[in-house]
């Protein structure tokens, strides 16, 4: 008892601080948020793929229920890992890109493969080969920028090396290009942008120049070399070419050969060792590292996979610098890519709003039902389920005889309501304005009469057409008969002559 009384007295004393004392404390104390040298306990600078620097994202809410479904991209089972990955392949010279991709498909025993943009048979270098689920990102990779290192052969000698460097600088920006004579596409004029180019080395004796180019997807380096020769006035052609970067990945980012892929699959088949296969194939999330990120709650993931709108209440975190119509990636809390999307809100709008559509889905990447279905669990949906169980609604959730009038008036079924066309709505408005039912009936009769008249006219026209065709056929018939008679007479004469000749020979 004594302890409880002493505690109560302490509480009273703590509460009984006069306003004067509070004023003294506020005057004497230094109140400011001081800078701290302590590093945050959570350092995500070394986290993998899309979770890198996760702690630097803006927090909208930290409250969500984690679900045990899904997994970190690097810790997927080997079957899922292979079927949702890509290979940064060093394409060999001579086989075409399609041949190489077909060989990889056969080696890995998968159903679907795709690549990040064709390379000519003689060209080597980076070719991103996407496997199964990663083929959904092929289009975005094909339109990504590329970098090449090429060798140009000039037909005549130059005065100095600077001429070639100057000509390369001239050929930057938007250029007109027509595909080479031997090309798999229609040879029509097109505009392609060259972002940057520089001369690496020039050999005046052999008249060979090595250059580096960063350009838009679909640029013909062979055509660029021809233009370079024309600009210098000596003529030129491409001798050799290698792609050193395709989109996000370059030749220093774990480039593998065809032999590496074959050995990795052999190692897995015979020794059940999947480490080599995991070093050759990378998760598809690595292709999306350059995109801005939005993190969704686990309960919203499957709805997005089924095509639901990306709404603000489902957002956990979002990145700085998101602009409207910018391509972004929507991810889970485990770092898996759900879909690529086009942003409909900026970062500032996301931070100030509490409702609305954040982004429009561009391409869903994740398979459906990887996470459980969590829609239809709201108050209205739960009430509807209860009413179906009690028999107040039919099995499809539609009203029946025993449905209460409050439900019929208040509930809006969005699956059945359709947007009415402007013409129908305007006609109805006119009828409402005119008011009388008699006028509406008269209008209906008039329309029915006009429809009947139009039908009769159509029938008449059809009859007239038939008669004309019959007359034309009758006129042509006798002429055809005459020609047939003359042809038959000629045939008979020929037969007679043939018989006579046979008789003479006998």
Curated annotation (Swiss-Prot):
Reactions it catalyzes: uridine in 5S rRNA = pseudouridine in 5S rRNA
Gene Ontology biological-process annotations: box H/ACA sno(s)RNA 3'-end processing; definitive hemopoiesis; mRNA pseudouridine synthesis; rRNA processing; rRNA pseudouridine synthesis; snRNA pseudouridine synthesis
Segments for region (Disordered): 1-26, 391-410, 419-506
Domain PUA as annotated: residue spans: 291-366
Active-site residues per Swiss-Prot or TrEMBL entry: 120 (nucleophile)
GO MF, one annotated term: pseudouridine synthase activity
EC primary class: isomerase
Compartments it resides in: Nucleus, Nucleolus; Nucleus, Cajal body
Disruption phenotype: Dkc1-deficient larvae have smaller eyes and head compared to wild-type animals, opaque lenses, defective development of the jaw cartilage, bloated fourth ventricle, pericardial edema, and hypoplastic pronephros. Inner-ear development is impaired. Reduced pseudouridylation of 18S rRNA is detected in Dkc1-null larvae at 4 dpf.
InterPro entries registered for this protein in UniProt: Dyskerin-like, PsdUridine_synth_cat_dom_sf, PsdUridine_synth_N, PUA, PUA-like_sf, PUA_sf, tRNA_PsdUridine_synth_B_fam, TruB_C
GO cellular component terms attached to this protein's record: box H/ACA snoRNP complex; Cajal body
Quaternary structure annotation from Swiss-Prot or TrEMBL: Part of the H/ACA small nucleolar ribonucleoprotein (H/ACA snoRNP) complex. The complex binds a box H/ACA small nucleolar RNA (snoRNA), which may target the specific site of modification within the RNA substrate.
Name the record gives this protein: H/ACA ribonucleoprotein complex subunit DKC1
Species annotation: Danio rerio (Zebrafish)
Gene: dkc1
């Amino acid at each position: 008892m004594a302890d409880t009384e002493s505690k109560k007295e302490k509480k009273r004393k703590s509460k009984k601080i006069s306003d004067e004392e509070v004023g003294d404390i506020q005057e004497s104390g230094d109140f400011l948020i001081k800078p701290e040298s302590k590093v945050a306990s959570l350092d995500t600078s070394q986290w993998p793929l899309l979770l890198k620097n996760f702690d630097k994202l803006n927090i909208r809410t930290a409250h969500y229920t984690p679900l045990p479904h899904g997994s970190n991209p690097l810790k997927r089972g080997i079957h899922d890992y292979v079927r949702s990955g890509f290979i940064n392949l060093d394409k060999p010279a001579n086989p075409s890109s399609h041949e190489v991709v077909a060989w990889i498909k056969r080696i890995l025993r998968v159903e679907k493969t795709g690549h990040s943009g064709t390379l000519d048979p003689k060209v080597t270098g980076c070719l991103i080969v996407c496997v199964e689920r990663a083929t959904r990102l092929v289009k975005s990779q094909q339109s990504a920028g590329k970098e090449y290192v090429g060798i140009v052969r000039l037909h005549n000698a130059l005065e100095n090396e600077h001429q070639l460097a100057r000509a390369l600088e001239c050929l930057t920006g938007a250029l007109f290009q027509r595909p080479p004579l031997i090309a798999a596409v229609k040879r029509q004029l097109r505009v392609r942008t060259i972002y940057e180019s520089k001369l690496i080395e020039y050999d005046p004796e052999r008249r060979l120049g090595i250059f580096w180019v960063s350009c838009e997807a679909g640029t013909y380096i062979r055509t660029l070399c021809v233009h370079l020769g024309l600009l210098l006035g000596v003529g030129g052609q491409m001798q050799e070419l290698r792609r050193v970067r395709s989109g996000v990945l370059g030749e220093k980012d774990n480039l593998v050969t065809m032999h590496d892929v074959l050995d990795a699959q052999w190692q897995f088949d015979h020794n059940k060792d999947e480490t080599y296969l995991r070093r050759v194939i990378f998760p598809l999330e690595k292709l999306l590292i350059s995109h801005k990120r939005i993190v969704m709650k686990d309960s919203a993931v499957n709805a997005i996979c089924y095509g639901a709108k990306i709404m603000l209440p489902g957002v956990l975190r979002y990145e700085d610098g998101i602009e409207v119509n910018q391509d972004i990636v929507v991810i889970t809390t485990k770092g898996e890519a759900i879909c690529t999307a086009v942003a409909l809100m900026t970062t500032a709008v996301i931070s100030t709003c509490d409702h609305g559509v954040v982004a429009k889905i561009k391409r869903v990447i994740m398979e459906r039902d990887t996470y459980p279905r969590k829609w239809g669990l709201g108050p209205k949906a739960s009430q509807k389920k209860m009413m179906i169980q009690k028999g107040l609604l039919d099995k499809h959730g539609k009203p029946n005889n025993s449905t209460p009038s409050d439900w019929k008036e208040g509930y809006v079924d969005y699956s059945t309501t359709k947007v009415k066309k402007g013409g129908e709505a305007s006609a109805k408005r006119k009828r409402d304005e005119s008011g009388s039912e008699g006028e509406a009936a008269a209008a209906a009769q008039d329309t029915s009469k006009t429809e009947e008249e139009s039908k009769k006219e159509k029938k008449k026209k059809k009859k007239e057409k038939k008669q004309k065709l019959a007359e034309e056929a009758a006129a042509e018939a006798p002429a055809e008969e005459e020609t047939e008679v003359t042809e038959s007479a000629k045939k008979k004469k020929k037969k007679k002559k043939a018989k006579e000749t046979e008789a003479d020979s006998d």
